[in-house]
């Protein structure tokens, strides 16, 4: 046993990379970045956390509630400096799945919204160098799992099929 962590969070969740993980409070505003043996960073955000993703290189993506947009996705460097943020519109949706490419240069984001009273799921790829999201798909099925097959290919597993995007 390397460590034992007592978060005290009401709705704890975890996202892991190769050498660190983030433990966060869903619907709360606190997160902790941990290595195998110690706390690296603790952060209290202004808004409630929806979802986090950790890359293999320690880059952290945090999707939060926002007063100015539907959701705010903030990407932090391994030293917890803000690298970029994306204020997601009502048309783009609220993130429900996120996954970093193995090289940590891009982030796949599945988001949900409603259009004409119907559920709509949107899939985006966000380049961390440019910060501009590119929409890969839009449909009525929400990905149950999202990941990268390589640095250029995203796999989305839906309820009744799996789709590869290049």
Where do the language-model regions lie?
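Short acidic/polar, Gly/Pro-enriched loop/turn segments located at secondary-structure boundaries
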Residues: 8-11, 26, 34-40, 47-48
